[in-house]
């Protein structure tokens, strides 16, 4: 089906299996489903599809201007389209679906992209915009997948599974989520990053911002060489922060100042490194065989502090354990200037 001008299609359903629809502008309005399996929908200008379901597996949907795909609470399937062209808009791209399946799929826009889906499955898929990317989803699966924005990225919703996946923003990244599973995954921005999540698991993963990074979570797990890093200031707030076994490549690292607030901090064999001042406020702290280093002043307010075989170092250090015990057996407190320790009891054997 081909039209030199604009083409408007209204029907109960449309079967374009292995077919081709070409027009100068395309609007498809259906009561039911559109089957574009191995088919092609091509528009030189705008393209819009509305219906109850859209299946474009192994297919191509392409527009020279803005594109809107709306299946309401239905399924939009774009699987296995990495080598087929997938869904591509030279303008903005707006998608609404109950379930968006982009497994091993390809979905891109040259301008702003907005996705609203109850469930978004981008496993081993590519989904991106050369401008901003805004995603609202109850469940987002991005294992070994890639979500990329040329400018800002905004994620909101429920659970994000990004194991071995990539979330990348060319400028700022903002996420408001329930759970972020980023084991062996990468979450990176060239600007500022702000993440507000209930639970964050970054074991072996990378949370990196070229500018400031703020992460607020009930539980933060950054074990097994997990890396949380900022090019400017870094702010972490959690009820429980685990930063164990950082190894040579992991830890919590900032080029600028660092602020840590935690109910419980376990940094056994972990690394906390600030390029400037470091302010730490916590309940119980375990820094056994760990390293806490500030290139500026280090202010420490906690309850019991276990620094056995650990290192706490700063340009100047002030430690207050609120009358609790400081266990520094085999540990080191190293201040280039003034060192102040206020504690209930201190064990400094071999320290």
Language model features with spans:
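A composition-driven surface/loop motif
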Residues: 1-351
